[in-house]
Amino acid sequence: MAKKVAVIGAGVSGLISLKCCVDEGLEPTCFERTEDIGGLWRFKENVEDGRASIYKSVITNTSKEMSCFSDFPMPEDFPNFLHNSKLLEYFRLFAKKFDLLKYIQFQTTVLTVKKHPDFSSSGQWEVVTQSDGKEQSAVFDAVMVCSGHHILPHIPLKSFPGIERFKGQYFHSRQYKHPAGFEGKRILVIGIGNSASDIASELSKNAAQVFISTRNGSWVMSRISEDGYPWDMVFHTRFKSMLRNILPRTVSKWMMEQQLNRWFNHANYSLEPKNKYLMKEPILNDDLPSRILYGAVKVKSRVTQLTETSALFEDGTVEEDIDVIVFATGYTFSFPFLEESLVKIEHNMVSLYKYMFPPQLEKPTLTCMGLIQPLGSIFPTVELQARWATRVFKGLCHLPSEKTMMEDIIKRNEKRIDLFGESQSQIVQTNYVDYLDELALEIGAKPDLISFLLKDPELAVKLCFGPCNSYQYRLVGPGQWEGARRAILTQKQRILKPLKTRSVKAAPNLSASFLMKILALVAVFVAFFSQLYGF
C-alpha cells in the first residue's frame, strides 16, 4: 500500500512536492486554504490574513532558465524575467502537465498536525483540517509543510521611538499593492531588501520625494549581466562556484566588489555595505541607481527618532513633512498548526537538518519545504528538497543519527554567520550551487564532471562553465529525464528567443572558445588531483 503524504499549501513548494510524491509512488493529499494554486505568486488586490502578499509589479529576480523545474522547461517565448502573472501561468501549465490539481483540496485550512499515538513505531501524523466550517481528521504517513515563510510581517516598532506620535500613515510592505494614492507624498521606506528597493523605485516616479533608510547598506546588482545575459546565468556556474570556494575570501570578495562597482560606485551612492566582506544577498534592481541619480530617491542612515511629521537619522540629519512610512522589514517564521518544539528557531538558528528535517523526531516523516534563502532561484532548490524528502519517506534514503544531524546544524549555522552575518534576514541564507549539489548527492543525482568529460566533452563544458540549472540534476540517478541533455545544450536558444524580435546580422562565432574551455576544464582537474594526491 502506498504511503499517504499530507502536503500543506499549494504554492510553488506544494506543487513540486505533489509531483515528487507521485513520481515516487506515494499518495499525496494537498490542503490549500485558498481557492487556487500559486501561493505567493498569485497577486490579489486585497491583503488576506494567513496568505503571502505581493505588489502588482513584482518581477522575478531569477531568470526563466534558472528558475524552471528540471523536467519542464519554460516556453521559449516566455521573457527571461517574468512578471508574477507570467510565472503563475507557468505553474498552471506545470500543474496541468502532471495532472496535480486532482490531489488538492481547496479552501481547506490545516488546524493542527500532531504525532499519532504510536508515532515512535509508525511515524504517522494526525492532521486536523477545516472546510466549510466542518472539521475533519485524517492520519498520514508523512507531512510536507509547504506553507511558506512570507506571511507573518516583522514590524519592529519598538526600534523606532516616537512611532506612536507619528501622524502620517505607516504600514508593512506586504500591504503595498501599487503606487496609486501616493502621488505627491513624501515617503520613507525602511529597509533595503528587494521589496524595499522595488517599492521605493516605483513610488519615486510620482511621489514628491522618497527616502530609503538602511542600517548597513547593500550591494545592488542588475538583472542584466555580461553581453546582456541574465545575471544568474553568468554568476551561477560550477567553475565560478569552485573558484569562490577555493580562493581566500578576501580575494573573492575583492573580485566581487570590483564587479559590482563596475556598474556604479556604491560609495558615491551611499549604498556601500558597512561590512562589505560578508556575502549578504545583493539587491536585484535595475532602477534604483537611476532613481538615486535623478534625486527621486535619497539614501539615508538608520532612523533613531520619529516625531509627528519628521524622521531623525543616525547621522544627525532630519527629514521633515513625512507623509508615509513603509516598513520593508521582512517576515517572522510561523507554523501555527505545528507544535513549537518541532521547528525550533532560537538564537538566530533554525534547528532543521539541511533546513528541512527536525532532528529530534524518532521517524523522519515531517519536513519543512522552502524554508531557505539561497543566493539563487528557490524553485530548483525546493524541487531537490522534495525529491530527497520523498525518497526518505519511502525508505530509499536515510538520515544520520540525531547527534550527527545536530552537529551538522550547528556547524552549518556557524558557517552561515561567518559568510552572511547574524542578521534576522540571513537566518536561512545559503550558497546556491553548493546546496543544490549537497541535496543531489543525497539522491544520487549529482553529475560527475570527470565521467562526462570522458564520454561527452561538449556537455562537460556546459556543466562546468555554463549555468548550473536544474536540468543538470536529471542527467543521472533516479528520475533521469531523457530531455535533460538537449535542454542544457539548447538553453541559449530559449534565452534569445524572446529577445530576437527584429532581424539582425549575427556576430561571428569564435570557434576557439569551445577548445579554450576544454583546455581550461582539463587544467582544473589536473590542478585538483595534483593538490589531492600531492603530485
Swiss-Prot record:
Cross-link Glycyl lysine isopeptide (Lys-Gly) (interchain with G-Cter in SUMO) residue location(s): K492
InterPro entries xref list: FAD/NAD-bd_sf, Flavin_mOase, Flavin_mOase-like, Flavin_mOase_2, FMO-like
Primary location group: membrane
Residues bearing PTM N-acetylalanine: A2
Binding annotation for FAD: G9, A10, G11, V12, S13, E32, L40, W41, N61, T62
Family annotation (Gene3D superfamilies): FAD/NAD(P)-binding domain
Binding site for NADP(+): T60, N61, S195, A196, S197, D198
Tissue-specific expression: Lung.
Coiled-coil annotated residue ranges, if any: none
GO molecular function, one term: flavin adenine dinucleotide binding
The protein's enzyme class: oxidoreductase
Keyword Transmembrane helix recorded: yes
Keywords in alphabetical order: Acetylation, Endoplasmic reticulum, FAD, Flavoprotein, Isopeptide bond, Magnesium, Membrane, Microsome, Monooxygenase, NADP, Oxidoreductase, Transmembrane, Transmembrane helix, Ubl conjugation
Cofactor(s) listed in the protein's UniProt record: FAD; Mg(2+)
Subcellular location field: Microsome membrane; Endoplasmic reticulum membrane
GO cellular component: endoplasmic reticulum membrane; membrane
Pfam families linked to this entry: FMO-like
PANTHER family reported for this sequence: DIMETHYLANILINE MONOOXYGENASE
Protein's name according to its UniProt entry: Dimethylaniline monooxygenase [N-oxide-forming] 2
Native source species: Cavia porcellus (Guinea pig)
